[in-house]
Amino acid sequence: SADADIVVVSNIKYPASVMEKNPNLKYVCVAFTGYDHVDMAYCREHGIQVSNCAGYSTVAVADLVFGLTLDVLRNISTLNAIVRQGGTKDGLVGPELEGKRFGVVGAGAIGSRVMRIAQAFGCEVVCYSRTKKDIPGVEFIELDELLKTSDVVSLHIPQTPETTGLIGAEKIALMKPTAVLINCARGPVVDSEALAAALNEGRIAGAGIDVLEMEPPFPAGHPL
């Protein structure tokens, strides 16, 4: 409505071109954790207040991280498909998570919870974050070192101009051929073309992806 004072949005784009049709707009409630889909510059310029739902999905996302990690690492979905087609699991049972080096990129609420769970699995946990925190048992290291040495790399960073495309061909090339990449953060922080190439060429062992550059829908012909 063009005369609305308050607008509630979820994870759909809410650009200036739409907001400017709402001259009475005073408050945008983002029913979502991230708010990069809202034109914050326009809101600041016009005195429009914006709030998000930080923390509502922390537990759920952290759970999903380990669902994907175990699925990819232990080949659960792959083996399910093979067995249903009459094959066997011989030679395809993946490694255990315990004892692996678990690298977390981003130490916000979700990243911090993921680190605690990884420790409970018996992993050696390392983290890269611009803002370091005092988390017992976690070593903070540079991103390149994390990528080179981790068995699991889990992304937990917001989408910003600096993080868009952060995990591209150059960064993926640093990862071990036995490593897996988990992205439950934002789709655009990973270069999908570069990731697909690395997977198809066997340069990394696997990936668990919950987010893409375009949502929704899953675009036809997408490399992943």
Give residue ranges: language-model regions.
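Short, Asp-centered acidic motifs that coordinate Mg2+ and/or phosphate
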Residues: 5-6, 27, 152, 180, ...
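Short glycine-/small-residue-rich Rossmann-like dinucleotide-binding loops
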Residues: 12, 33, 129, 151, ...
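Phosphate-binding beta-alpha-beta segment of Rossmann-like dinucleotide-binding domains, i.e.
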Residues: 46, 54-101, 113-120, 127-128
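Rossmann-like dinucleotide-binding domain for NAD(H)/NADP(H)
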Residues: 50, 178-180, 184-224
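Rossmann-like dinucleotide/phosphate-binding beta-alpha-beta segment
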Residues: 91-177
